[in-house]
Amino acid sequence: MELAHATPRTLTEGDRALYTALYGSRFALQSGDGFAKHLGFRQSPIDDLLVFHTVFGKSVPDISLNAVANLGYAEGRFLKPAYPGEMLSASSEVIGLKENSNKETGVVYVRTHGRNAAGEQVLSYVRWVMVRKRDAGARVGETVVPKLAACVSPADLAPPHGTDYATLFDTTLSGSPHRWDDYSTGEKIDHVDGMTVEEAEHMLATRLYKNTARVHFNQYTEGKGRFGRRLIYGGHVISLARALSFNGLANAVSITAINGGRHVNPLFAGDTVFAWSEVLDKAEIPHRKDVGALRLRLVATKNRICTDFPDKDDSGKYPADVILDFDYWALRPRKL
């Protein structure tokens, strides 16, 4: 079953400026045209997560408007840069369905595709979401749970053609001298800074993505619900944590794949977000000597600094102040 989502969205320089104002991202590739052109891009591309949130937002009315929770992500691939002035559209195919034991909710698995006006894929990812059944007594068909890769293979990563991340990469302008070669598997990085979430900012951000899920907007209904207040969109947390990761990962200039991710606890306005990262793996990219990939685990907390790298325990249970566990591949320049 495939769903074509309304409506297309042209991303502009204004959208990019607003995204920067919301999160304070400082990565050089998405900040400066001259810097990007030196690497072979035609201009500074739209931030990868702004593309992700825009495509995600297109799917909400058809997939998760009244969702209980967005549960996770897998097999995300950024396939082509998006530039200001380009129009994006989205479609999704249902690839799995599982009824929960309470018979009142179930989990839907979808693969969503984002395309530009030429029909070229710029993004593809899987997510699964818990939704309520319209009729709790209705019979559900056969359970189908898709087999998803634990991570995107380095062979499937897609640095843009015609780019050179190493030769003219200016580490003074980028804010860090450290390249792919300087990181070690198992290394942990505290990103130090914190950022407090405001009610108006997260609603503005969610509207920017045309994400209409009522849990983020409607205090009248959410005030009567489980938490008694509006829930911060999980993507807002991802973008905040990614922006904070500039401290220590300034040259991780592109997200090239999303391996997985979980929103493990809720976030509300007034909470302060901190983050830390762990290097899970390093990979060379076939036929590219200028750029390598780091597999990074980005963990975000609320109201807790990360000097001790707060994490799940041996049983897999997370502390109440850990809110995000996000696994992704990032591109970094290599040493020549």
Report residues per predicted region.
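Short, low-complexity cationic-aromatic patches
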Residues: 46-47, 79-86, 233, 265-269
